[in-house]
Amino acid sequence: MRPLLRSGSMGAMTAVFVHGVPETPAVWHGLLAALDRPDTVALSLPGFDSARPAGFGATMDEYADWLAAQLERLGDPVDLVGHDWGGGFVVRVVSTRPELVRSWVTDAAGLGDVEFEWHDFAKIWQTPHAGEDFWDQQLAAPTEERAGVFQMFGVPQEPALDLASHINRTMADCILDLYRSAVDVGRQWGPDFAAIPAPGLVIIPSEEPFMSAASSTKAAARASARTAALEGLGHWWMLQDPARAAAVLREFWATLA
């Protein structure tokens, strides 16, 4: 699966960014511009602004395995950064394939909490018929109306319109399959998310509506990771304040040996 964005040469330490749902790698555009790091890769999850491979079930384990395979292709250990479900796949990869990373950053550490509870949107998507009805309505709505949902959660207008414009049937079907595979994600992935050898950073936005700070903090402690609180920012922190997001990453990476 191709990276959407890439700069620099593969001889340098690579930073790999993984988006969430319903998103594309474009969520990282502003942050990467502010970061100005010489070698970055922003991956496109299968089925999200890219084709869904034949036979790909879009389950949480298949996506995590897919990410591990992408990192293997890069060769050397990477600085891995994930948001939303991308952050969840980071949780899984550093738990099962820690040799693939030099460091890791996630805003979805709660998926590695054995007591994790899903948010209301997830529960709809995990429910047969209700999930299909939700996405049927979204796909039938004008792009501007879909963008309004993102704006309700703090996304500025232009990136909200971009996010909304990329939602399609393939993406919706992948989201349904992903969430239905992950009803018990905390109990399945949580036990392995402990004492991760590579340095980690868990980002905790104060206005995050989909994952509790308590769950993220508890999971970070079990994984031996640091935490970074982002006051005043929400789920799409990298779109709300790209410069601040880049500064947090630079500060963390500066501590690595």
Regions found by a protein language model. Give the residues of each.
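Short beta-strand-to-loop junctions in surface cap/lid or active-site-entrance loops
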Residues: 2-13
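Short beta-strand element of the alpha/beta-hydrolase
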Residues: 14-19
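A short, Lys/Arg-enriched amphipathic alpha-helix followed by its capping loop at the start of a domain
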Residues: 30-38
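Catalytic histidine-centered segment of alpha/beta-hydrolase-like enzymes
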Residues: 233-242, 246
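Flexible "cap/lid" subdomain of the alpha/beta-hydrolase fold that forms the substrate-access gate
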Residues: 21-22, 26-27, 41, 46-79, ...
